[in-house]
A protein has these predicted regions:
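Active-site neighborhoods and metal-handling regions in enzymes and metal-associated proteins
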Residues: 1-228
């Protein structure tokens, strides 16, 4: 059942790397579909219901964590943290999407940040979070860094750009459902090189005055999966 000696690399009976990648493709498509449905004037509570409808239409409503959509100042909060559900998306605003759908036996996990207008700082934040993600991911590829070392690197990369890294989103395992029954430790806490397809790198950055933030997450994978 567990092909690895290290219990933190354990998988369940339905684990299949190829199917995990298909779950990832469905998840990334769902994030984009949800983002496309967000309109200025929409309340955050309405946005979450819209996101759930989209996931249901895609056969992805069952998830291993709740559906999160955050607008404006609520983007400084992690999923599950208290936030104003009546926050309305503005014409010149920032928002993030964070979903963890299950496709059949396999878990997906994806998040991204988008802007609705031309606010340069918000746009830079949304762009920088992706740049930091890929900088950390390439560091993982080139150095064999441990999970803990990746988040030390992420902190430096974030601060160099003038943002604050939120360590309350420290990365995690992913597997056949439910991974939390198999392994439930943060990526930032492991002292070995995380394996491709088994770990999700989460990057959540915030404006130092906590006015807004940005989020991006995806599987740890090599460059070929991001060149399409």
């Amino acid at each position: 059942m567990n092909p690895h000696d290290n219990p933190l690399k354990a998988v369940g009976p339905h684990y299949d790397a190829a199917q995990m990648l298909i779950a990832r493709e469905h998840t990334r498509a769902a994030v984009e579909a949800i983002a496309a449905a967000m309109q200025p004037g929409m309340a955050e509570s309405e946005a979450i219901e819209t996101a759930k409808d989209i996931l249901a239409d895609m056969g992805l409503l069952r998830g291993w964590h709740d559906v999160y959509v955050r607008f404006g100042s609520n983007t400084v909060q992690i999923g599950g943290a208290p936030a104003d559900p009546h926050r309305v998306l503005g014409e010149d605003d920032i928002f993030l999407v964070d979903i963890g759908p299950c496709w059949q036996h396999w878990e997906g996990d994806g998040g991204d940040t988008f802007v609705t207008g031309s606010n340069r700082e918000m746009a830079r934040c949304a762009e920088d979070v992706k740049a930091i993600f890929h900088e950390v991911r390439r560091h993982w590829l080139s150095t064999g860094a441990t999970g803990r070392q990746l988040y030390e690197f992420a902190k430096a990369s974030t601060e160099r750009r003038g943002w604050e890294l939120n360590f309350d989103l420290p990365g995690h395992r992913i597997s056949d459902f439910p991974h939390k029954a198999i392994v439930n430790v943060p990526l930032s806490g492991i002292e070995f090189r995380p394996s491709q397809e088994l770990w999700v790198l989460e990057i959540h950055i915030r404006d130092k005055d906590r006015r807004f933030g940005a989020f991006f997450e995806d599987m740890l994978l090599d460059d070929s999966y991001f060149e399409r």
